[in-house]
Amino acid sequence: MEGSEMAKKRPGVVISPDEMNHFLKTVTIAPLTSNMWSVHWRVRVFFDGQNGMIALDHIRSVSKTRLGDCIGSLQMSEIKIIKHTIKTMFVDY
């Protein structure tokens, strides 16, 4: 990996819609990080027993074959924040 790309294997949040995921061999994900760098394009969550951030600045598509087991799910309030943040990043910025 180059620059500031996240290189190591890490958990992530699938952000592509279920309807899309059903038909494609890839899913769109945002990696989770324990780096608590507080900027508006990262969303704070509690995962795997610790506080962390969804790194929406590192969104990417990956093959479904690279996915591991599901470790949890998000609350609707967290999903709304993620959607708002993505909209702000790519539409309203």
Give the positions of each predicted feature.
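Conserved functional hotspots at enzyme active or ligand-binding sites that engage polyanionic ligands
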Residues: 1-93
